[in-house]
Amino acid sequence: MLAIGLLYDDTLLAMAAIWRRSETFAHAWLVPPIVLWLVWRLRGELALLAPRPAPWVLLPMAVAAFGWLLGDLAGINAVAQLAVTALLVLAVPAVLGLAVARRLMFPLGFLFFMVPIGEFTTGVMMEWTADFTVWALVATGVPVYREGLQFIIPSGAWSVVEACSGVRYLIASFMVGTLFAYLNYSSPVRRWVFVGISILVPIVANWVRAYMIVMLGHLSGNKLAVGVDHLVYGWVFFGIVIGIMFVIGARWQEPAAAPRAPAAADAVGTATPAARVWPAAALAAITVALAPAAAWALQHPMDRPPLVLTLPTLPGAPDAAAQVLKLPPHFEGAATQAHRVYAGEGGAVTVHVAYYRHQGYGTKVTSSMNFLIPSDDRHWNRLAAGVARVPVPALGSQPLAMRAHELIGGRTASTVGREHLEVRQVYWAGGRLEHRSTWATAWGLLGRLAGRGDDAAMLTFYTDGQNPEAARRVEAFVGQQLPALVAHLEQVRAAAR
């Protein structure tokens, strides 16, 4: 484990950095001491077990190390951190044997709560929270006008932002509920039922919390629950709900199972000589060392000319008179960004390109920190989002799947006189066009492993107006001009080789 800590220190430190800066994962600081305490509780049983290395576990360790390599090259924190945690877990049976690992199954599994993962559910939980809040308001006689995650009631405007999603409550409840179930129940059925309850309760509680916050503000004339205090009310409510859940769960507490005597083959009297334990530890260390060595070789920077990106003149699409970037998409860590406004049939179409090179954890095109507009944007609101199938004859007979967004400007209870934008987006990664971030990451990783570099980009197209005219305009532009833009990006990539 010491070797894993030294070889993968960057990944472990990055994990701790997330615990420090993100309140969502602050609970992870408690995981290592809890695991040590759980192991200490079992010290009497562990003392009866003989260490018997299991060399075959080196194979899953190699798979986990390769998973870390892929996650590190792709800049995916969750994959790299899950892989390192798996290495820590697998090191126990590899060096100390399966009997020890079986007895430590829960403490070792609990280590995975160190990994700061789960924020991918934020979007869908925000939608669920908004759906329930609006439904509950209407059910209690409060009229609501809704636009995406924003809604307006007679007393004011409200929005569901990331902090309202309930992900923080869910992850904390899941961790504490899992520990509670292990310590208080011996039946697997009761344990799994309580873990399921610890997932369901915070989701529903967060919906009720959001509704109560809005109603507090509404009934108090926006004097209560409209500032920082509504977060305080939320945590108090959550604490009460979780406390009640544990009190009820304790009513079905079961006595702890009696310690099991080890099998004769696992008993201390049959201990494996230290001369066999140390070679197993050395082989495990060598296995886990291969992935960091490969990562260093693949990521060693090469001298390349500076990146210059200007969007080209396109045939049949002259420049528009006004070159104003009306909607600047948010892309962190891009090597360069460029935009150009083209005059099209019926109106102008703006093209924005965020170009990435030498991608890493904080500088990747598919980062969750990259978005079209933030959820609390004051200038634009998302009316709809989905996938559009856009015919691009030069790229094949199958329509190209693109991300589709309909945006509206301002925040009032009327759509009259408000600006609309019709937006289409697509990734260019590994020489392919892809609308799904996971596949874009995969194509980029394959290109990197094949020695073609990791250049990638997000192409954003938008035009003024409402469906269906604006949608036809922007999609017609994409169908005609996307091949030329892709060819230009290929030239930019080739110029740096």
Specify the residue positions occupied by each region the protein language model found.
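Hydrophobic N-terminal alpha-helices or hydrophobic patches in metabolic proteins across all domains
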Residues: 1-497
